[in-house]
Structures are given as C-alpha cells and as structure tokens.
Amino acid sequence: MKKKDIINFVILIIVIAYAAYSYYNKTYDYNETEFLMDTIVNIKVEIKSKDAEKVVSNTFDLMRELENKLSCYQTASEISKFNADEIESLKLDEDLKDIFAISSKLYSESDSLYDITIGRLADLWDFENEVIPSEDKILESIEMVGFDRLEFTDEIVRKPAGMKLNLGSLAKGYIIDKAVDFLKLNGIESGFVNAGGDIRIFGQKKPLKIGIQHPRSERGELSGTLSVTNFSVVTSGDYERFFIKDGIRYHHILNPKTGYPADTAVSVTVISKQAVLADAYSTALFLLNPQQAINLANEIAEIDAIVFYLENNEIKSLQTENMKQYMN
C-alpha cells in the first residue's frame, strides 16, 4: 500500500470513528411536566437515548412516593397518622432522620422561629376562604408548638398528644434533591428540576438566568435576576398565599410565637447547592428581622441570600456578602 493510500485510510478511520462517537454521544433536550406537591413540576434534562426518557418518568414516581411519605395532607401517610395520634411514635427512616436533623439545626439557629411542629397552627388559617382564626384558637394552637418537646431515640420520635407536624417548609426542597440524585445515578448528567419556582440546576456548563419575582407587582414582573450554575434557588414570599382584610396582609408564613403571619420580610431568596437548604432557610430567614436574617446567612457557608422588606412603605433589600456575584 502506497504512503498516500495509508494516509487516506487513516483519515477515513478517524472520520468514521468521530462520526460514531458523535452519534453515540449526541444529546437532546427532554421535558416532562406533572402536577405534584400542589404545584407544577418540570424536569428538563439532556439525554442520549429514548431509554433515558424512562428515567425521567421513574423520577416522577420517586417524587410522588416521597410526597406521600412526607405530606401531612395525605391521610394514609405515616405523618398524617402521627398527627392524628393514631400511632404513638413515628419510625425514623433515613429520609425522616435527614428531615429532622435539618429542622433541629434551623430551630436552634432561628431562635425557635423555624419550627416544623407548627401544623396545628397552620391548619387554623384558611387562606382560600380568607378566615382569620379567633384569638382563643390561636393561643390554644401555640400551646401545641415546640420542636424541643419532641422526644427522639435512634429509631423513633414521639410527640405530645395534639401536636401536629408540618414539613411544608423543607419537604419540597428535599424531594427535589432526591430527584436530582436519582437522575444522576441513572446516567442523566445535566438538567434541572423546577417545582413551582423552586429550582435545582445540575451539570450545566453555562449559567442559567433565574428571575426574582417582585413582591408587590404582577406575576412575572421581576425585582432582579440571578445567573447561577449548578445551584438551587428558592424564594419565600408573602405574595404566594395570602389575603388582605382591613388593609392588613395575611400570608402563609406564620410566626410560631405569635400565631400570626410574620411581618418581618416580604420576600427572601436563597441560593444553595442543596434545594432542601435553600427551601428551609428561605422560611427561616423570612421569620427573622432583615438584619438578623442576613447576619445568620453570612455565617452559613452553604447559602447566600437576599431579603426584601418594607420600610416606610418602600421596598428595601439586604443581601449576603457573596450574593452580588450572582445578581444581574
């Protein structure tokens, strides 16, 4: 074989090999959306084959399974049975151990304002029918709040009769994290999980722009945008579930010490590698006064945050030292 023919043959082999590599490593975007956790959940990923589409469907199955476990609104869940005093103790599997460990940490850091034993108080407030509970009912419910009253062993947790848990301030973030873990474990390298605006991005090379809803404007009007790569972004705001009566805004983020909606912030956005931390801290920081919230956030290496609050009817903000690198 002549030298020229050898060179041409080698080039041909390289071209074929590259074409084969490109074919088998070709990716395309795949979207799937379902209604879970009382919101619209969207999973968008880069995949290489139709087989990977099944992974996304299985991810939704996992999320649904976790929702059924952690929800206090699913009557068949162990949490609901525990809340109804149908069972004396709640068995702690790995998911619940994680949930309670995070809850305990934030309870301590927030001067007892972040409290997942707020379930009975939360049940009092009817935001759909715009009902303000009576003072007597609120005081009665406050008596049933207190994370430090839970009794733990290695395997179970017990509570006082009448106390109710509500994991709504961190369950969504926890489920998002588990969904991302499952996707990655099954070969999905890049994408995001978005549950009603609570989002976790993974495997992305380029930053994704995330809008921060303006707390006093129409839906879709922004107070700013973030550019993030492989982070979670979660916002808690007093504009999500609320009603206004006699000029007072009543919203769903309740202060467990007063029994009424917190009047400290109007919106808190938290960035973290873990969605569960972004979710939980967005509530915890909301319950603190703005300066306390930012002081705490600056001490927590795993998060950055921006707090919007009202001062003389004007919206102002405070942010952590590192937050500006994400702001546009």
Give the ranges of each region predicted by the language model.
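Mature catalytic core of soluble alpha/beta enzymes
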Residues: K2-N328
